[in-house]
Amino acid sequence: MKFCSLFHVLSFCCTLAYAVPKSQFLQLHSLSNAIPVEWKWYGSVDEDSGYVYLTSKDSNEARSGSLWSTSVLRQVGWQLSTSFVAHVSENENTFFAIWYTSAVGSEGPVFGASDKWDGLLISQEIDQTGKIFVRGYLNDKSFELAQFTDPDLPPFAKCTIESSPEALNNIILKYGDQSGLELFVNDKPCFQVKDVILPQGYYFGVSSQSTSAKDLVALSNLNILPPDTSNNENLNPTSNTKQSVGDNTSPQTVIDTEGLNAIKADLAKLFNLVESQRQKMDSLHFALTNALERLNDISSTSQFPSERFNALEKLLHDSLSAQSSTADGTSKHLAEFEKEIKKAMGNAYSPYNLTNFMVFLLLGAIVSYGIMLVRRDRRRHKYL
């Protein structure tokens, strides 16, 4: 009799062990660069064939289930990546939520979380056609979400994503102190809000709630990654690997754009200097022409002493000498710069050969014009 009782007790314990998952703590990350996170489940959660069902497949009543991280995240920025399949078979929609809150949620009326939560909620409602209605909420324990939505708490962002029934949907949620909050659904941008500020040291959670025994949400992965993971395709381990285009082509030529931009900047400065000298020379030419005409008129009448003429001639001579010196310096600068351009052209890459050739032609024109100004200055100086 005692042996039979002991046998029944052992059989009952084995049945319980088989009916529930082996462990209440899961490691769901599947990417090599993911931050290791341990998840604890609440409510009706099942494991089967590589999926984690947030609502039990065997329950015949409305149910909710959730997974919450067992430790907080200390990083300023982060990315959450997950993939899920929603089975919606009746009139009522199925709900799936992503959380970032100050406290771990427990079983409750809001997608499997308690009311008056503090933090971020990304709500996803899936209908029979597979269409996903996404809404983002922020709460500071002020609002009670006794149902799926609260009219007093409008979403700060929302979008609608077209999908198909029982399709594998990929979710990527990014947060950074500079970029704000971004959400991608099936590689499509849902929203980006830059003025959302989330504190450090909060818990992550995912949850689901359904009103039908035939509706459920199954997760295939759940990864928390550093904020510097930039390639969206690498965040999704279930996406197909795309063959890169041009694998057999030769590597592209690296172009020294900084050096070319520096040359263009120097050329622009030099052109402005030559243009300024040209304007000064034109003004000086006009003034000297009038001065020489006036000097000839005065010398013909001999109304002033000769020292006045000598002083005026010295003034004109000094002015022309100064302009000639400036023109000589400009010409020398142009000649040196021409050598640098030729040297740079010898080291330039093929995509910029045409640009360098045009720069060389423009430089030649500037040099020629500068030499002409110098010669004209010297002719005027010789005339005086």
UniProtKB/Swiss-Prot annotation:
Residues 20-224 form the L-type lectin-like domain. Residues 20-353 are extracellular. InterPro entries: ConA-like_dom_sf, Intracellular_Lectin-GPT, Lectin_leg. One of its GO terms (molecular function) is D-mannose binding. GO terms for biological process: endoplasmic reticulum to Golgi vesicle-mediated transport; intracellular protein transport. Its main location: membrane. This is L-type lectin-like domain-containing protein C4F6.05c. The chain crosses the membrane at residues 354-374. It is found in: Membrane; Endoplasmic reticulum; Golgi apparatus. It comes from Schizosaccharomyces pombe (strain 972 / ATCC 24843) (Fission yeast). It is a single-pass type I membrane protein. SUPFAM superfamilies: Concanavalin A-like lectins/glucanases. Residues 1-19 form the signal peptide. Residues 227-251 are annotated as: Disordered. Keywords: Endoplasmic reticulum, Golgi apparatus, Membrane, Signal, Transmembrane, Transmembrane helix. Residues 375-384 are cytoplasmic. The keyword DNA damage does not apply. It comes from the Eukaryota.
